[in-house]
Amino acid sequence: MSTANRTFTGLLGTKLGMTQVWDENNKLIPVTVVQITPNVVTQVRTPEVDGYGAIQIAYGQIDPRKADKPSTGHFDKAGVTPRRHLTEVRTADFAEYALGQEITVGAFEPGTKVDVVGTSKGKGFAGVMKRHNFKGVSASHGSHRNHRKPGSIGASSTPSRVFKGMRMAGRMGGERVTVLNLVVHSVDAEKGLLLVKGAVPGARGRIVFVRNAVKGK
């Protein structure tokens, strides 16, 4: 089934951190707590005008004085105050949404599977052993100041270059990461909290995007 024919729910939230809770079988379950205050619909895209169906949602209150004129006009058209973060969710039921409509964490149900998209923690410049899990060079037997080096990165005059994609040292982390098929443990609609089994990308306080599982059954 194509994405255009599927119904999706996606919300922006803030990762608060991890904790442990007991389930109905008295098992200790590690969960990540995501705070999802109401997201508002700021635009509805239709196949007739835009070529596809989707909704644009906004999250995170900001001081209206800090919004530029184009953004202020965009939010005024939707009848909402300016927000800091915007994203689009492609869904087949886009016609059921209206400008200014609020979507709460209650859109997710316990036991269902979700995908979580976030930005991984930045590690700075890292070597190949940390960045790519290289084994390294022997501690002895002729190894002289080579213990954490990558070794050869290519041949000689043929091909006289380093191939693209060669795993080398460089900046690590700070990338978009998607974790698939995490199970929703519980939902606290009053406090706007979503508890997801397992870990999600990013540091505490970072923005994450939670959606229905694309590949989940």
Curated annotation (Swiss-Prot):
GO cellular component, one term: cytosolic large ribosomal subunit
PROSITE patterns: RIBOSOMAL_L3
Region span, Disordered: 137-160
Transmembrane segments: none
Gene Ontology biological-process annotations: translation
Gene3D superfamilies: 3.30.160.810, Translation factors (2.40.30.10)
Signal peptide residue numbers: none
InterPro entries, per the entry: Ribosomal_uL3 (IPR000597), Ribosomal_uL3_bac/org-type (IPR019927), Ribosomal_uL3_CS (IPR019926), Transl_B-barrel_sf (IPR009000)
GO MF entries: rRNA binding; structural constituent of ribosome
Disulfide topology: none
Keywords: Ribonucleoprotein, Ribosomal protein, RNA-binding, rRNA-binding
Pfam families: Ribosomal_L3
Top-rank taxon: Bacteria
Family: Belongs to the universal ribosomal protein uL3 family.
Subunit structure as annotated in this protein's UniProt entry: Part of the 50S ribosomal subunit. Forms a cluster with proteins L14 and L19.
Function: One of the primary rRNA binding proteins, it binds directly near the 3'-end of the 23S rRNA, where it nucleates assembly of the 50S subunit.
Name listed for the protein in its UniProt record: Large ribosomal subunit protein uL3
Originating species: Clavibacter michiganensis subsp. michiganensis (strain NCPPB 382)
Biological classification of the source: Bacteria, Bacillati, Actinomycetota, Actinomycetes, Micrococcales
